[in-house]
Amino acid sequence: FLVSVPFFKIIRMSDELPYRPCVGIALFNQDNKVFVAERVDLPGSWQMPQGGIDPGELPEEAAMRELKEEIGTDHAEIIDRTEDWLCYDLPANLSRKVFKGKYRGQKQLWYAMRFKGEDSEINLHTEKPEFVEWKWVKLKSITELVIPFKKAVYESIVEQFFWIVDSDVNR
């Protein structure tokens, strides 16, 4: 007795949702260490500044705005950008909470920037604080600090921006 079962693919609802267009910033100090901060809403979870691109806004404008909004200063200059969008999916429970179910995750253009200010200019007590603590770390170590669902994106950032750590360019 044989039963023919048609082939089908199980698709999670989130697989059909779009990615939210965003930017991320790898902010390097003069010692070629990168800025990371611990999230207010996820204790123990560290990340670099990132955020959405507003309608009509250029990605590099969004990067400078996000820097100012999240760390209180935009005293930086762009030195590089990822060639392609880097994407990650949010876990379903976070996607519903963070994006009200409109997006499956984020697609990000990442900018490497050189911080031109003093550490004292960094202020996490912004209008809508996202971070509780910050530090400068070696680029390679950021993958150990980030939440697991962002790890692949951060590994790509390390690979694409590693030339900065290995050179004296833009010091």
Language model features: what each stretch is:
Residues S14-V34, G52-P55:
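Conserved N-terminal beta-strand and adjoining loop/helix that marks the start
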Residues T143-R171:
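Charged phosphate-binding loop/patch that engages nucleotide di/tri-phosphates or the phosphate backbone
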Residues D74-W85:
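A short coil-to-beta-strand element that immediately follows conserved catalytic motifs
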Residues E121-T126, V146-P148:
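Short, charged, solvent-exposed linker or helix-capping segments at domain edges/interfaces
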Residues N32-A76:
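Conserved Nudix-box catalytic region and its N-terminal flanking loop in Nudix hydrolases
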Residues D84-E121, K135:
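Active-site-adjacent beta-strand/loop module that shapes the phosphate/pyrophosphate-binding cleft
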Residues F1-R12:
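N-terminal amphipathic/basic-hydrophobic helices that include classical n-h-c signal peptides
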